[in-house]
UniProtKB/Swiss-Prot annotation:
Assembly notes: Part of the 50S ribosomal subunit.
GO terms classed as biological process: translation
Classification of source organism: Bacteria, Pseudomonadati, Pseudomonadota, Alphaproteobacteria, Hyphomicrobiales
Signal peptide span: none
Entry protein name: Large ribosomal subunit protein bL31
Organism listed in the record: Rhizobium meliloti (strain 1021) (Ensifer meliloti)
Biological role: Binds the 23S rRNA.
Length: 73
């Protein structure tokens, strides 16, 4: 293996949409950083059978709906 070509692998805290927190190792962020998830397996429609409403953080869903509202889909 070549030296000094791999990203830094460290411990981060992940906060799920229901507030559950856990620690894992990742190359994301810096040591001790917190990753707040907007969608996780407990809230994603693919894993909940479509029963969960999408959370519109940043206005992306409403922007999409406004853009394509005339199509009647």
């Amino acid at each position: 293996m070549k030296a000094d070509i791999h990203p830094d692998y460290h411990t981060i805290k992940v906060v799920m949409t229901d507030g559950t927190e856990y620690e894992t190792r990742s190359t994301w962020g810096t040591e001790g950083a917190t990753m707040n998830l907007e969608i996780d397996p407990k809230s994603h429609p693919a894993w909940t059978g479509g029963n969960q409403q999408l959370v519109d953080r940043g206005g992306r869903v409403s922007k999409f709906k406004k853009r394509f509202e005339g199509l009647g889909l």
